[in-house]
Each structure stands twice: as structure tokens, then as C-alpha cells.
Design a protein with these regions (language model features):
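Post-HEXXH active-site segment of zinc metalloproteases
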Residues: 80, 84, 96-130
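Hydrophobic beta-strand residues in large extracellular and virion-surface proteins
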Residues: 17, 37-41, 69-71
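Active-site scaffold of zinc-dependent metalloenzymes
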Residues: 46-80, 93-97, 101
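Long, well-structured alpha-helical subdomains associated
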Residues: 120-151
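Zn2+-dependent metallopeptidase catalytic core
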Residues: 12-36
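Hydrophobic or amphipathic, alpha-helical segments that drive membrane association/targeting
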Residues: 1-12, 39-49
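Surface-exposed helix-capping loop/turn segments at secondary-structure junctions
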Residues: 28-35, 100-102, 145-151
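Histidine-centered divalent metal-coordination motifs
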Residues: 88, 92
């Protein structure tokens, strides 16, 4: 995986964040797909305060099975929150890269998830199926990371 990290808070090790991101990518997408994905991880102070979000993920190249992504993350999170949030956002990278999630360019508020269209202006955030999947699996992925790091 091609990974660039910007504005990493000094309380975190560059190697740790790199290894964690690569672990999540390989675990979610397998080595073959993960090796063809590029992620730009950007930390921003006050992101949650200005946007209401701890983090978000967006594709940068093409909405049909994209390979280039940016993940924006609030720089003021603690370690567990950051690693769990990164797991959540990497699940979205997997959803986009595998073609499970696709933003509809002709209708910006509509996304297709596993073949079904959803207007996210008319649904609560937690009822969006791609968010349900990310929320339901982020902690398990984080726990798998902790087990992996014990080895």
C-alpha cells in the first residue's frame, strides 16, 4: 500500500501509524488489493469542532472501484480512539475499493451500497448500511490489531 501521513501529532509514532494502517488494509482487503491502494492520511487539529466529525474518508481518483483515498482525522484523539477510528475509516476504504460502496456522481446525496441506492439526506447516519458495517466492525478490527501486536 502506498501511504502518506501528514501532520501526525508528536504523541504518535510514524512507524506505528504506518504499521497499523497497513495491518488494517491487509486484513480488510487482502494483500493483493491492498498493494494497489494509495491512502493519504491527514491529521487536522480541531476537525471535530469545525465539522462535527472525528474523521472521514473520500476517494480521490474514480468513483468506480477507486484506488486513491484521503482519510482526514482529528489530531486531538487519544490512542485507542484514533486506532479505532482509523479502523472505521479503513473499512470505508475497503468498501470503496471492492466496489461495495459507490457515490453517485449525478446525485451527490445518493450512494449505492451492495447494489442498493440510499439517499443519505433522508436517512439517519447510523442507519446507513455502510456506516453500520463500519461501526459494527471497527472495535473487532482494533482487537485483532492488539492481538497481532502481542506476537
Amino acid at each position: 500500500m502506498d501511504l502518506s501521513i501528514r501532520n501526525l501529532p508528536t504523541k504518535f509514532s510514524l512507524n506505528t501509524i504506518r504499521n497499523v494502517t497497513e495491518f488494517y488494509a491487509n486484513r480488510l482487503m487482502g494483500n493483493k488489493l491492498a498493494n494497489h491502494v494509495s491512502v493519504r492520511l491527514v491529521f487536522a487539529k480541531g476537525l471535530r469542532k469545525t465539522t462535527g466529525c472525528f474523521a472521514w474518508c473520500t476517494w480521490e481518483d474514480d468513483n468506480h472501484r477507486p484506488r486513491e483515498f484521503t482519510i482526514m482525522m482529528d489530531a486531538r484523539m487519544g490512542e485507542k480512539m484514533l486506532l479505532t477510528t482509523l479502523a472505521h475509516e479503513m473499512i470505508h476504504v475497503k468498501q470503496y475499493a471492492k466496489g461495495e460502496l459507490k457515490d453517485m456522481l449525478s446525485a451527490p446525496s445518493i450512494s449505492r451500497f451492495r447494489g442498493k441506492l440510499y439517499d443519505f439526506n433522508n436517512l439517519d447516519y447510523m442507519k446507513l448500511p455502510w456506516e453500520k458495517e463500519a461501526h459494527n466492525n471497527e472495535f473487532q478490527l482494533y482487537e485483532e490489531l492488539k492481538e497481532y501486536l502481542k506476537k
